[in-house]
């Protein structure tokens, strides 16, 4: 979710390097002369490898351009924003990080679901729902099933059935409330509520 600071930087951008799954209305803040470069990926299909993105950011910055890197979701939560920042700094480029509001909290809130609530959940965890080694992730989910608190799984739709199965096999009651939210910031927004036993999209 964007902030006023982010919108102000977009107005000044000479180059915008942007991801998939962003709110396209944000690009309306850019001036007409801004060079817009799409580097997104979806479902494992990359328009550009991460190393190429790093090199592109460095190249444009070395041209003296004011570059804005607009990442989908939270750039520092499973978003590789830290890798890009470290690459640029290691090559002598000054960076400024302008945080938005993390989707892990904002999207559930938009759906009327607080991640913590008195007498229900006093903590929450954020877990990736997609990784190269899914077997180890399922094992981690099973092992964490005994923990209290709200679990937020980002990018987990493809593996929803396996995630819920891992939670139940780890000891979470089947009637534990669950929700699936997709398209949190665009017109594809959809929410489905249920339990671990029956949730599906």
For the regions a language model picked out, list residue spans one by one.
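Short hydrophobic/aromatic-enriched beta-strand-loop microsegments
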Residues: 34-41, 92-96, 115-122, 171-180
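Class I SAM-dependent methyltransferase SAM-binding "motif I" and its flanking Rossmann-like core
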Residues: 72-147, 190-193, 197
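Short, solvent-exposed amphipathic alpha-helical segments in soluble enzyme
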Residues: 4-9, 31-34, 83-87, 113, ...
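Hydrophobic packing residues within well-ordered alpha-helices of enzyme cores
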Residues: 26-27, 88, 107, 163, ...
């Amino acid at each position: 979710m964007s902030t006023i600071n982010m919108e102000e930087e977009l107005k000044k951008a000479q180059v915008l390097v942007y991801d998939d799954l962003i709110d396209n209305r944000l690009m309306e803040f850019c001036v007409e002369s801004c060079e817009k470069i799409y580097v997104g990926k979806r479902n494992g299909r990359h328009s550009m490898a991460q190393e190429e993105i790093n090199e592109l950011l460095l190249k444009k910055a070395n041209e003296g351009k004011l570059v804005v890197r607009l990442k989908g979701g939270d750039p520092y939560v499973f978003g590789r924003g830290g890798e890009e920042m470290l690459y640029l700094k290691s090559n002598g480029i000054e960076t400024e990080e302008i945080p938005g509001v993390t989707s892990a909290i904002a999207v559930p809130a938009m759906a009327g679901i607080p991640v913590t609530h008195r007498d229900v959940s006093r903590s929450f965890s954020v877990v990736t729902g997609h990784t190269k080694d899914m077997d180890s992730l399922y094992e981690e989910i099973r092992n964490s099933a005994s923990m209290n608190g709200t679990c937020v799984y980002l990018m987990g739709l493809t593996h929803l059935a396996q995630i819920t199965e891992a939670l139940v096999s780890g000891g979470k009651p089947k009637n534990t409330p669950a929700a699936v939210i997709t398209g949190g910031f665009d017109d594809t927004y959809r929410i489905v509520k249920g339990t671990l036993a029956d949730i599906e999209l």
